[in-house]
Amino acid sequence: MADVTVKDIFKEMPNRFNADAAKDMDAVIQFNLTGDDAGQYHAIIKGGKLEVKEGTHPTPKMTMTMAGKDYVDLTLGKLNGQMAFMQGKLKIAGDMGLAMKMQTLFRNG
């Protein structure tokens, strides 16, 4: 099986989305991924619905910055988000409360 890429993760993001956890939410999350598997994506969450787009959003509520490989590992459950943050592998700008909700909004896998 081929290695999972950042593009694969964002393509599958709607399948991992927990609409019930986001039913009252209105937020944009920007993902700035660096390194070999780099890319910029944003997730628009509104009223329990998710839309994922490539590129940057002008007014995200929260921005996550990390290496593409680390983001893949985080999404697959191979890297703990809190540990990644403490080790400086994950940088968060904006709404830290939203960052804490990421595990309930998206299932690993």
What residues fall within each predicted segment?
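Feature captures hydrophobic
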Residues: 1-109
